[in-house]
Every structure is written in structure tokens, then in C-alpha cells.
Regions:
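P-loop NTP-binding core
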Residues: 1-149
Length: 149
């Protein structure tokens, strides 16, 4: 499985635009491959863009996904993982995914999205603490990183 990451701690560098264009182009060129986009940004700009952007109500669609049960975002996924962080979940990650093409006809059908969420700001400290706990017989860092991988 190939992984591509866009990251820069500085805002305004073009991460969202570059990621959006790369994802869509790759999806068009490789229609038989499934692409999972994980938006790990509390601002969720990439999610909004994939869901329709400014002109097609991407922000409102994202709010709907955040209001779903379960909350169909990475924050919703983490919210259910936090109470039992070191054990396998009783739910499936599929419950949190969104198919952007259902909301934005310009997005290829082979793209799935785990939407960004403002809750990540609040969850970051808890997740960091859990990853750094010292529990005999448990590699807590791997257990937490495994939530995504």
C-alpha cells in the first residue's frame, strides 16, 4: 500500500490545493485503485473542498457529516477509540468514511474520505498522553498509531 502525506506546520503554503489536485489527478489516472484520504487537520479545508467547496456547499455537507451518528469524521473515530485505546474496536472504520462523489459530482468515485474535524484540537493532548503511557507488555505508541494504520 502506497502512502502519500502532505504536511507543513506553516499555514498558507498550499497544502490543501496541492493535496486536492494530486488526489484527484491520481484518482483519474488510476480508476481501478481505491484512494483513502485522511484529513488530519482540525480546519478540515481538504474535506470541505472534496465535498463541494465554497460554491457547492462543502462546508454545510461537512457539518452534516459531523452531526451524523456516529460522527463521520476522524474526530468521531477517535472519540470512540479514546475510552478503550489499547484494545481492538468493536466497530468498523467504514462507519466513519464519506464518499465525496455522492456530494460533489466532480470527484472520482474511487476516493473515500475520512473527514477532518475541529475536535482534533481537543483530542490531540489525550492521544499524545495515551501514546506515551508506560504499560508493561504494551507498546502504547504502536497501539495508538495503529488506530490509523
Amino acid at each position: 500500500m502506497e502512502r502519500i502525506t502532505f504536511w507543513n506546520n506553516k499555514g498558507g503554503t498550499g497544502k490543501t490545493s496541492l493535496a486536492f489536485q494530486t488526489i484527484c489527478q491520481y484518482a483519474h489516472e488510476n480508476p481501478s485503485e481505491k484512494i483513502l484520504v485522511i484529513d488530519v487537520c482540525p480546519q478540515a479545508n481538504l474535506s470541505e473542498l472534496l465535498l463541494g467547496g465554497l460554491h457547492q456547499g462543502g462546508s454545510n455537507i461537512l457539518l452534516q457529516r459531523q452531526g451524523a451518528t456516529p460522527r463521520a469524521t476522524i474526530g468521531g473515530y477517535f472519540q470512540l477509540r479514546l475510552p478503550s485505546p489499547y484494545t481492538p474496536p468493536s466497530f468498523t472504520a467504514q462507519d466513519f468514511l464519506t464518499q465525496p462523489y455522492k456530494y460533489n459530482k466532480n470527484i472520482p468515485e474511487n476516493i473515500d474520505l475520512l473527514c477532518g474535524d475541529p475536535m482534533l484540537e481537543l483530542q490531540a493532548n489525550a492521544i499524545s498522553t495515551l501514546a506515551n503511557n508506560q504499560i508493561p507488555g504494551t507498546n502504547t505508541w504502536i497501539a495508538i498509531i495503529d488506530w490509523i494504520f
